[in-house]
């Protein structure tokens, strides 16, 4: 398609010292792969949520032990669970509410729920959460200058 044969591409990867980190994605051996970005590349129908989104928005100083994503109800997420990704499901009507993008610590852009949606999600599941993460996120949100209380109430 681009005028490069498969054998030429394979030879380039070998000569450049690249390693395959995902289908169609290669990294130099010195580079650290961006796990969240790789998950997003392989799974276009996910949105990072809960503690993962809180961390990406700067509402938590703790990165979650495992990435947390939300998918539409009915989506077969068994491959995500095998990759040690925590999966939440929502009805289709709620899936797109509050979707936005955020930058990973490696500078890549991934889909996440906005701060207000994250607050709603953690309020619904606060008994499941670490209390310190919950309190830190709530305090950080309500102290932030870019909070949108009207949007929060709408959600």
Pin down the residues of each PLM region.
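Polyanion-binding surface elements
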Residues: 1-2
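Glycine-centered, phosphate/nucleic-acid-interacting loop/turn motifs that mediate DNA/RNA or nucleotide
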Residues: 16
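Nucleic-acid-binding surface
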Residues: 8, 13, 21, 25-154
């Amino acid at each position: 398609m681009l005028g490069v044969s498969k054998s030429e591409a394979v030879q380039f990867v070998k000569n450049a010292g690249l390693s395959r980190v995902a289908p169609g994605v290669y990294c130099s051996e010195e580079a650290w792969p961006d796990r969240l970005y790789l998950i997003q590349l392989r799974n276009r129908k996910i949105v990072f949520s809960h503690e993962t989104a809180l961390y990406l928005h700067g509402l938590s100083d703790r990165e979650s032990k495992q990435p947390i994503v939300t998918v539409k109800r009915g989506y077969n997420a068994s491959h995500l669970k095998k990759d040690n990704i925590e999966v939440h499901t929502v009805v289709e009507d709620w899936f797109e509410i509050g979707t936005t993008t955020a930058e990973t610590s490696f500078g890549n852009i991934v889909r996440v729920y906005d701060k207000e949606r994250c607050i709603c999600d953690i309020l619904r599941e606060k008994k499941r959460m670490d209390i310190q993460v919950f309190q830190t996120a709530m305090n950080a949100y309500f102290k932030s200058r870019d909070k949108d209380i009207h949007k929060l109430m709408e959600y």
